[in-house]
Amino acid sequence: VTSYTLNEIVPLKDVVPEWVRIGFSATTGAEFAAHEVLSWSFHSELEETSASKQ
């Protein structure tokens, strides 16, 4: 069994609205394969703005 790891830091606040849903898609062309997400991790930090501190 071959295992791959994908790790990417993306500043989502620059490209998506405040509320989003995340999905996955995979393909192997004409061949059949099972794609499984065995682990998922999400980390978010909310930075306070001057308006939210008031």
Swiss-Prot record:
Domain of life: Eukaryota
One of the record's GO molecular function terms: carbohydrate binding
Any matching Pfam family: Lectin_legB
The family this protein is said to belong to: Belongs to the leguminous lectin family.
Claim: Protein biosynthesis is one of the keywords in the record: no
Subunit and interaction comment: Tetramer of two alpha and two beta chains.
Protein name: Lectin alpha chain
Keyword Metal-binding: no
Keywords: Lectin
